[in-house]
């Protein structure tokens, strides 16, 4: 007696699962392009190199207080924060979890936060003592 024709409760559940699996299975086409939109390995490498490049940048910025160093440090921090927040949003604010509308709002808010942070830090660099001098003042307390 075959498992599918059996009328026990386990066999019925198994048949129902097979029917559900047949209805919900999706075939994903495989892209043959060398760099597809879904390939994030290059982006991941750039993020890692960027983070590694910030290791000598931060101590150097402590000793060099120029507007150019302020600008470089500002861009480095803003990009690092942007990629971090974008990663969190892409992991936890998926449309499947929170809905399409909230997922779009979350993705848009990442860019809004990034623009506000960049504008604020550039304004601070131009109208006040600058980022590197401010860090030195904080550490001298």
Curated annotation (Swiss-Prot):
GO terms for biological process: mitochondrial electron transport, succinate to ubiquinone; tricarboxylic acid cycle. Its cofactor is heme b. Heme b binds at residue 80. Pathway: Carbohydrate metabolism; tricarboxylic acid cycle; fumarate from succinate (eukaryal route): step 1/1. One of its GO terms (molecular function) is metal ion binding. Keywords: Electron transport, Heme, Iron, Membrane, Metal-binding, Mitochondrion, Mitochondrion inner membrane, Transit peptide, Transmembrane, Transmembrane helix, Transport, Tricarboxylic acid cycle, Ubiquinone. A ubiquinone binds at residue 92. One of its GO terms (cellular component) is membrane protein complex. InterPro entries: CybS, SQR/QFR_C/D. Residues 1-24 form a transit peptide. It is a multi-pass membrane protein. It is found in: Mitochondrion inner membrane. Residues 64-68, 127-141 are mitochondrial intermembrane. It comes from the Eukaryota. The heme b is bound between the two transmembrane subunits CybS and CybL. The chain crosses the membrane at residues 45-63, 69-89, 105-126. Gene3D superfamilies: Fumarate reductase/succinate dehydrogenase, transmembrane subunit. Residues 25-44, 90-104 are mitochondrial matrix. Membrane-bound small subunit (CybS) of the mitochondrial electron transport chain complex II, which together with the membrane-bound large subunit (CybL), anchor the catalytic subunits to the inner mitochondria membrane. During the free-living egg-larvae stages, which occur in an aerobic environment, complex II acts as a succinate dehydrogenase by transferring electrons from succinate to ubiquinone. Belongs to the CybS family. Component of the mitochondrial electron transport chain complex II composed of four subunits: a flavoprotein (Fp), an iron-sulfur protein (Ip), and a large cytochrome b (CybL) subunit and a small cytochrome b (CybS) subunit. There are 2 developmental stage-specific forms of complex II which have the Ip and CybL subunits in common. Complex II from the free-living larvae (aerobic environment) acts as a succinate dehydrogenase and is composed of the common subunit Ip and CybL and the stage specific subunits FpL and CybSL. This is Succinate dehydrogenase [ubiquinone] cytochrome b small subunit 2.
């Amino acid at each position: 007696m075959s498992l599918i024709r059996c009328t026990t409760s386990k066999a019925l559940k198994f048949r129902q699962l097979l029917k559900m699996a047949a209805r919900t299975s999706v075939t994903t086409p495989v892209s043959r392009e060398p760099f597809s939109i879904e390939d994030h390995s290059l982006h991941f490498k750039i993020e890692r190199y960027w983070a590694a490049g910030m290791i000598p940048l931060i101590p150097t910025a402590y000793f060099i207080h120029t507007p150019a160093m302020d600008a470089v440090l500002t861009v480095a921090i803003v990009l690092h924060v942007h990629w971090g927040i974008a990663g969190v949003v892409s992991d936890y604010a998926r449309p499947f979890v929170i809905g399409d509308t909230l997922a779009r709002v979350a993705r848009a808010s990442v860019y809004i936060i990034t623009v506000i942070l960049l504008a604020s830090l550039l304004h601070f660099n131009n109208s006040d003592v600058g980022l590197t001098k401010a860090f030195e003042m904080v550490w001298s307390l």
